[in-house]
Amino acid sequence: MLIALQGAVSQGVLWGIMVLGVFITFRLLDIPDMTCDGSFALGGCVCAVLIVNNNVDPLLAVLAGMCAGAIAGAVTGILTTVFEIPAILAGILTQISLWSINLRIMGKSNTPILAKGTIFSSVSHMTGLPQSTVAIILGIVLAVAIVAILYWFFGTEIGSALRATGNNEYMIRALGVNTNSTKMIALVLSNALIGLAGALICQSQKYADIGMGTGAIVISLAAIVIGEVLGRLLPGGLTQFSVRLASAVFGSVVYFLIRAIVLQLGMDANDMKLLSAVIVAVALCVPVVWERYKLRSSYTKGDEANA
């Protein structure tokens, strides 16, 4: 059980990087970007092929996976901004095309890297720590660094314009901001993080698979919603932007812990997609029910005071 929970934490932290990417489009830009399933697998496929077929350094392979994800995001951005295709449809088109592209890149449905070195195995050899522990430590370090960089970036003029585009596109456009540029930046940045996560998880699990991105959007949304629900329990709630970013990563860890516990209790692994959908639905319903409860309680207290 302890080993399963440790593996869940390592997976949760690494997936948290992807969740941050989805957070940018889903929460900040208010765009349902469906590219992520494809760009996640793209990052993993590019990373695996470079390591296995070209003996590229694992770190450079990760950076290449991140760049590949950014290119996928740019394609979606071009379809959305230049050709004015609705964002959700543009993402679906890119996602579908990436399925064939990933197959072309690997030349087969999966590519194992069991005999090759990875970032995690290299650090494990240097430190003597188990690879599962190394994955947790490196994942936390990367997640903290990315959260800090995103917090700084979204405090800049460009980052603030990007956030304002998601809040009120017409207002920010009236102020002279090119919203097409902000959308493009957001989609490229988002999918770069998703490609980075795909490459890291590829090295963590020692293989890349054509279907490794299937359902990634559901997992990410579940993590975001879980993180927001838990973040509201903090004294300051989600008022601080840094807390919103950190809660997305924390929500990812909680999601994978829940999944590991449920699997240990004997749930069929084939039912995990159903569990993910239920978690998202429940997490979305809880804030609504809670607000209605507080509103009803305030009405009751007001009636008692008037009586």
Feature annotation, model-predicted:
Residues 72, 132-213, 217, 221-222:
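Helix-loop-helix "hairpin" substructures at the membrane interface of multi-pass membrane proteins
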Residues 87, 91-155, 185, 209-210, ...:
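Transmembrane helix-bundle core of multi-pass membrane transporters
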Residues 1-18, 46, 54-60, 131-133, ...:
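Membrane-interfacial amphipathic/re-entrant helices at transmembrane-helix boundaries
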Residues 194, 198-274:
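Transmembrane alpha-helical segments in multi-pass inner-membrane proteins
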Residues 167-174, 178-181, 234, 239-243, ...:
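Cytosolic-side transmembrane-helix boundaries in multi-pass membrane proteins
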Residues 22, 55-96, 101, 143-144, ...:
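Alpha-helical transmembrane segments within multi-pass membrane transporters and channels
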Residues 27-32, 74-118, 123-124, 207-210, ...:
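Short loop segments and helix-boundary regions at transmembrane helix junctions
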Residues 26-82, 123-129, 234-237, 264:
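Membrane-embedded helix boundary and interhelical linker motif in transport proteins
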